[in-house]
Regions:
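Conserved alpha/beta-hydrolase "acid-adjacent" motif
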Residues: 469-475
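Catalytic active-site module of serine/aspartate enzymes centered on a nucleophile-bearing elbow/loop
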Residues: 486-542
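Intrinsically disordered, low-complexity regulatory segments
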Residues: 1-167, 356, 389, 393-397, ...
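Short beta-strand/loop motif that positions the catalytic acidic residue
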Residues: 456, 461-464, 468
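Short, surface-exposed "cap/lid" segments of acyl-processing enzymes
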Residues: 199-273
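Conserved acidic catalytic loop of the alpha/beta-hydrolase fold
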Residues: 273-277, 287-306
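N-terminal cap/lid segment of alpha/beta-hydrolase-fold proteins
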Residues: 174, 179-215
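Alpha/beta-hydrolase-fold enzymes
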Residues: 91-95, 99-158, 299-304, 313-446
Length: 542
């Protein structure tokens, strides 16, 4: 394929036969000899010329890396992206982690196993959790102190503030701070319905469906939004009418913002929240849940396909699910990855994450961070402090942890975003990110010459920031252009001056990023995919 199918207007299905032959080529089972993370294929540097578009490389199949103008470029000189991933260490496997044949493209992470509990084992568990609570309270206090010192440091690096419409920045909306999607939806004139999605493993996931009661007719084509780590579905609704979720509703789509396990107090059909088995999951299990999420939304809407938009961890779990479940790709008309979490950035190799990685084993990790929720003192602080104060404090702490800046944000949005950030999540999940993702330097095995993804992989759009240091997008682009012949790329957006959350929260994201998301969805919808069933829950035809 020397030309993008979308550039010619062809269907992506026309290339199934060619993709299948590529997928089974003789070198599929070979590994790259340079396991130290070097670039034997010579693909690094594809798409680095600053312009509206970058000329395609001979291996890029006619795909252009787009450089849309951002508000940051109005106040600062464009810089080359700092997108070096952490070194890849394939042999840094924990005793509990191994690569097995059932997962040929990514490293399998075996979560902790826990049997039934009697009164003695429950008592022992609670004693250990109390010890963990003491340690994490001390650790959180130290982090908060360091974060405040960083925030008050007059010499720390700051980027120029992006220009925002004066009237928009100064206006008073009358919103209060809330952790409920329903509140913001109703405040801005939308309707929010909450659904419980029960997965095959018994976990109950909360999903919020947003619609506009002022618009006549049906709801439109279904779009699923999946948030990142330590966030909830509220992440897509905190920028007023410029929120991604509301913006997509205004464009005529049926928006579903879904949550991972444990968010909004969601439970399990059998395991209680005190049970470690309730919290025994990592990114791979979150990818398993997405299969049930997609099936649920398709049943409710009556469509055969839907569009998926993920941010950060929401992209990593979908990448894993699409590799593991080949049929899942046939149910997605498109996949938009904002800040894709496939290669870690340098922020995850600094304090305090480097100290956390020094914990030598899962047993030691469970002693320090417990076997249930991660950092329970954070939840206690959330309950004690007023939402306004907690939002500002969380902004300072997470700014220190992830080394981000707020130069692209509207100031009044910050406490709204962070009063719903830092939610309690699985300790096992953080163990995966720090002991598998960061330690090895990739979710998948980059030594594989064969494609990571099958021919059923849906059309893909990727957007990443040039100063995103939490995860890096450019190495993923290089990999896609060099080896992933099964992936049909719609857009690649390299956003100058954007950080990890700016694709959703940036002051000009509604002009720079959102239209590309809509274009991806519209261009990949099957025109024959129309709803055909009555929704039993509401009794309305979609």
């Amino acid at each position: 394929m020397n030309e993008s199918a979308y550039a010619r207007g062809d269907s992506w299905h026309d290339y199934d036969d060619e993709w299948e032959s590529d997928f089974h080529r003789e070198e599929d089972s070979e590994l790259l000899s340079h396991s130290d993370g070097s670039d034997p294929a010579g693909v690094a540097g594809i798409g680095t010329r600053r312009s509206g578009r970058t000329a395609p490389d001979s291996r890029s199949r006619g795909v252009y890396v787009e450089h849309p103008h951002t508000a940051f470029e109005d106040v600062a000189v464009a810089e080359e992206p700092d997108q070096e991933p952490l070194p890849f260490h394939p042999d840094e496997l924990d005793p509990e982690t191994a690569k097995v044949e059932d997962f040929p493209a990514f490293f399998h992470h075996k979560v902790g196993e826990y049997g039934d509990f009697n009164w003695f084992s429950r008592f022992y568990l609670e004693i250990r959790q109390l010890f963990m609570l003491l340690l994490t309270t001390i650790g959180l206090s130290m982090v908060m102190g360091l974060a405040i010192l960083r925030y008050m440091n007059p010499f720390r690096k700051n980027y120029p503030k992006a220009r925002v419409d004066f009237e928009y920045e100064r206006r008073i909306t009358g919103e209060r701070y809330s952790e409920r999607v329903q509140y913001y939806a109703e405040f801005w004139g939308y309707q929010c319905e909450e659904y419980d999605i029960i997965t095959r493993g018994g976990w109950i996931l909360k999903a919020h469906r947003i619609s506009d009661p002022r618009r006549p007719g049906g709801r439109g084509y279904p779009v699923v939004l999946q948030h990142g780590i330590l966030c909830t579905s509220l992440f897509f609704f905190t920028s007023e009418e410029r929120s991604l979720g509301f913006w997509l509703v205004d464009q005529g789509f049926d928006v579903w913002s879904t949550n991972i396990r444990s968010n909004f107090g969601a439970g399990h059909t059998t395991n209680k929240r005190w049970d470690p088995r309730f919290w025994a999951w990592s990114l791979i299990e979150l990818g398993d849940d997405l299969v049930d999420v997609v099936d649920f939304v398709l049943r409710e809407t009556g469509y055969r396909q839907l569009a998926f938009v993920g941010h950060s961890q929401g992209t990593g779990s979908m990448f894993l699910a699409l590799e593991k479940y080949k049929e899942l790709g046939t149910k997605l008309s498109s996949f938009t990855a904002l800040g894709p979490a496939v290669y870690p950035g340098k922020s995850l190799n600094r304090l305090p994450f480097r100290v956390m990685r020094m914990v030598p084993s899962r047993w030691a990790w469970s002693l320090v961070f417990g076997v249930r929720e991660f950092m329970p003192p954070l939840g206690i602080v959330r309950q004690i402090l007023p939402k306004f104060l907690f939002g500002h404090m969380a902004y300072i702490v997470f700014g220190y942890l992830f080394d981000f800046h707020d130069h692209n944000w509207v100031d009044r949005h910050k406490p709204k975003v962070f009063c719903a950030t830092g939610v309690l999540t699985s300790s096992e999940l953080l163990y995966y990110w720090l002991h598998c993702f960061v330690a090895r330097g990739c979710v998948f095995d980059p030594r594989l010459r064969r494609p990571w993804f099958p021919p059923t992989f849906p059309p893909l759009t990727i957007a990443y920031g040039t100063i995103d240091h939490l995860v890096v997008g450019k190495p993923l682009i290089d990999r896609l252009l060099a080896y992933e012949s099964n992936v049909q790329i719609v857009h690649i957006l390299e956003l100058q001056g954007y950080e990890h959350m700016d694709m959703v929260l940036g002051c000009d994201a509604f002009k720079v990023v959102y239209p590309k998301i809509k274009d991806t969805i519209v261009r990949t919808i099957d025109p024959e995919d129309v709803p055909f069933v009555e929704v039993p829950r509401t009794g309305r035809y979609i």
